[in-house]
C-alpha cells in the first residue's frame, strides 16, 4: 500500500518552492543603481533657486575639475588650423565652433534639467594672446557659460568679471561655470599654448514655461582693480620674456661668430708661413674682441632681465617659463650651422634658468 500525499500539502510545497525561487532570483543591484543615480544627481550643480517668489536664476560661480583627456582627447590633439583669429584692440584669441555630444557634458549640466547645452566653442590662446580689457560673451543672456581647460602648456589665467574669481594659472581639467552675462576674461597667455572648451548652457523649454526671475548681477570693485593690476603685470612679464628670448638668440649668434673667428685665427697661426698678411690676423683678432665685448654686454643685460622676470613670475611657474624660453631660443633660425664646437658654447648649455 503506497503512501499518498494530500493534495493541499502538495500545493503548499509547490508554492513554497516557487516563492523561494523568486527570492533567489530577486535583482537587488537595481536598488543600488537607483541610489548611485541619486547620488550623482545630487553632486550636480543647481542653477535655479526655488523661493516663495518663484524660480530665481542663481549668480554663484561653480568651480570643479574633470578628466578631460578621456572625454575630449580628440580636441586636445587636434592640430587643424581652422580657428578664426580675433585680433582687435586689447583682445587676441583664436576660436572655432565644435559639436560635442551632450553625454560628454553631463558634468556641467544641472541636476534639475533646467538648462541644456546649446553651442560649444574651442578657444586657443598662444603666447601673448588674451584680453587686457573686456571679456568674451557667448550664449544666452539668461543662461550660463562653462569654461573647461583642455590643455595648458604655459601660464594661463582667467577672470570672471565682477566676481572675486581670479585664477592666475589654470590647470588641465579645471572647470568654471558662471552667468553668461558676466562673460569670461582670459588673461594674457605666458608661454606655451592653451585650449579651452566653452559651453553655452541655455534655459530649457520646461524652465521657460515655468518662468523664472533674472536678478541683477553683483559687482566686486576690488576684484576689478586686482584683475586690472594683474593684467598689466602679465603684460610686463611677457615683454621681459620676449626680451630674454631676443637676447638668447643674439647670444647664440655671437657665440657662433666667436667660434668661427677663433677657428679662423687658429688656421692663420697654423699656416703662418703661407699667410704672411699680419693685417688679416689683426683684423680677425679685433673682430673677436668686439664679439666677446658684445657677449659680455648681452650676458649682463640678460642677468638684469632675469631678475625682473623672477620678481614677476610665481615660483611654481618658473619651470614652465624656463622651458618656453629655452625652446624658443633653440628654435632660433639665425644659426643654421651647428657643429660640435658651436654647440659646446651655445646658450642652451649655459645656466640660463631663472
From Swiss-Prot:
It comes from the Viruses. Keywords: Late protein. This is Protein OPG055. InterPro entries: Poxvirus_F11. Stimulates increases in peripheral microtubule dynamics and may increase the motility of the infected cells, contributing to cell-to-cell spread of the virus. Seems to inhibit the signaling via the GTPase RHOA and DIAPH1/mDia. The keyword RNA-binding does not apply. The keyword Thylakoid does not apply. Induction: Expressed in the late phase of the viral replicative cycle. Belongs to the orthopoxvirus OPG055 family.
Amino acid at each position: 500500500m503506497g503512501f499518498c500525499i494530500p493534495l493541499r500539502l502538495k500545493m503548499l510545497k509547490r508554492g513554497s518552492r516557487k516563492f523561494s525561487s523568486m527570492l533567489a532570483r530577486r535583482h537587488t543591484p537595481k536598488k543600488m543603481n537607483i541610489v548611485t543615480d541619486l547620488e550623482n544627481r545630487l553632486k550636480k550643480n543647481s542653477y535655479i533657486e526655488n523661493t516663495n517668489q518663484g524660480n530665481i536664476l542663481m549668480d554663484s560661480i561653480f568651480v570643479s575639475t574633470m578628466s578631460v583627456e578621456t572625454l575630449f582627447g580628440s580636441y586636445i590633439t587636434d592640430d587643424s588650423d581652422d580657428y578664426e583669429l580675433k585680433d582687435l584692440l586689447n583682445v587676441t584669441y583664436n576660436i572655432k565652433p565644435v559639436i560635442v555630444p551632450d553625454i560628454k557634458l553631463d558634468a556641467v549640466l544641472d541636476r534639475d534639467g533646467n538648462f541644456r547645452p546649446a553651442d560649444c566653442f574651442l578657444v586657443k590662446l598662444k603666447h601673448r594672446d588674451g584680453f587686457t580689457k573686456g571679456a568674451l560673451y557667448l550664449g544666452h543672456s539668461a543662461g550660463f557659460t562653462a569654461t573647461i581647460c583642455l590643455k595648458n602648456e604655459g601660464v594661463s589665467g582667467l577672470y570672471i568679471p565682477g566676481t572675486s574669481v581670479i585664477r592666475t594659472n589654470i590647470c588641465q581639467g579645471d572647470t568654471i561655470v558662471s552667468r553668461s552675462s558676466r562673460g569670461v576674461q582670459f588673461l594674457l597667455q605666458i608661454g606655451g599654448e592653451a585650449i579651452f572648451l566653452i559651453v553655452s548652457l541655455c534655459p530649457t523649454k520646461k524652465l521657460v514655461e515655468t518662468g523664472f526671475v533674472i536678478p541683477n548681477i553683483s559687482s566686486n570693485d576690488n576684484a576689478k582693480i586686482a584683475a586690472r593690476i594683474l593684467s598689466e603685470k602679465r603684460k610686463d612679464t611677457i615683454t621681459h620674456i620676449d626680451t630674454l628670448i631676443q637676447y638668447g638668440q643674439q647670444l647664440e649668434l655671437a657665440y657662433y661668430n666667436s667660434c668661427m673667428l677663433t677657428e679662423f685665427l687658429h688656421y692663420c697661426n697654423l699656416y703662418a708661413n703661407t699667410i704672411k698678411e699680419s693685417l688679416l690676423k689683426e683684423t680677425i683678432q679685433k673682430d673677436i674682441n668686439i664679439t666677446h665685448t658684445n657677449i659680455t654686454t648681452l650676458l649682463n643685460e640678460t642677468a638684469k632681465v632675469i631678475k625682473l622676470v623672477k620678481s614677476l613670475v610665481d615660483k611654481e611657474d618658473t619651470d614652465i617659463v624656463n622651458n618656453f624660453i629655452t625652446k624658443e631660443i633653440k628654435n632660433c633660425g639665425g644659426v643654421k650651422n651647428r657643429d660640435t664646437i658651436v654647440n659646446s658654447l651655445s646658450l642652451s648649455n649655459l645656466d640660463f634658468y631663472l
